[in-house]
Amino acid sequence: MSPARLRITDRTGDLFAAPANTLLIHACNTVGSWGGGIALAFRNLYPAEFRVYRAHCARSTPNQLVGTALLIAPQRASLNGSGGGGHYIGCLFTSRRFGAARDPPDRILRATGPAMRHLMRLVAEEEERTGVRIGEVRMCRINAGLFAVPWESSKRALEAMELGDGEVPGCAQGGVVEVVAWERA
C-alpha cells in the first residue's frame, strides 16, 4: 500500500467558522506563549485549550518539544461559553522561541514535517481511543506569520511528507488527508 499524504487546498475566510469535530492546526513556539498573530486569536477563542498548551510546554524543555505536536481535545470550559466550538486544536512545535529569538526559517521547516506526522499519529490514536472521528482538518498558513517562513515553503514540506502506519487519521480518503489552509479575508 502506498504511504498516505497530505493534500493542501488554500482558501480565504474564517479558519474558526468550522463545524464541531474539526481539527484546527497552527504552528507554535515551545515556551507556552500564544501572544501574537493567529496564536493570539486561538488564545482568545480557546482559553482552556491555551492552559493545556501552556502546561504542556512547562513540563518539557524547548529542545524536547520542537518537531513534535500536541493534540488538545475540546475543553469543557471552552464549550460552555468562552468561544470554543467543539474543535480539536493541533499545535505544531516548529520554533523553540518567538519574536526576534525565533528559530531561523530552515530550522522551522525541518521541524514542520516531523511535527505534522506526530500530530497525525496523535489524531489517529485519539480516534481509536474515543471512537470520535475528526471530520475536517483546517489550518492557518502555518509558519508564514510571525515565524516569517514563506507559506509556499511550508506547504511544499507538508505535501512532500509521507504518513506511515499509525499516522493516518480516519478522515483520510484513498491515502490522502485533505487539509484546508485558511488565509484571512
From Swiss-Prot:
Annotated disulfide bonds: none
UniProt-listed CDD domains: Macro_Poa1p-like (cd02901)
Top EC group: hydrolase
GO biological process: peptidyl-glutamate ADP-deribosylation
Macro domain: residues covered: 1-185
Leader sequence residues: none
Keywords, sorted A to Z: Hydrolase, Protein phosphatase
The reaction(s) this protein catalyses: ADP-alpha-D-ribose 1''-phosphate + H2O = ADP-D-ribose + phosphate
Superkingdom in the source lineage: Eukaryota
UniProt-annotated binding residues for substrate: 13-15, 27-29, 34-39, 142-148
Gene3D superfamilies, A to Z: Leucine Aminopeptidase, subunit E, domain 1
UniProt KW Glycosyltransferase keyword: no
Enzyme Commission code: 3.1.3.84
GO MF, any single term: phosphoprotein phosphatase activity
InterPro entries hit by this protein: ADP-ribose_metab_enzymes, Macro_dom, Macro_dom-like
Assigned protein family: Belongs to the POA1 family.
Function: Highly specific phosphatase involved in the metabolism of ADP-ribose 1''-phosphate (Appr1p) which is produced as a consequence of tRNA splicing.
Name of the protein: ADP-ribose 1''-phosphate phosphatase
Organism whose genome encodes this protein: Chaetomium globosum (strain ATCC 6205 / CBS 148.51 / DSM 1962 / NBRC 6347 / NRRL 1970) (Soil fungus)
Gene: POA1
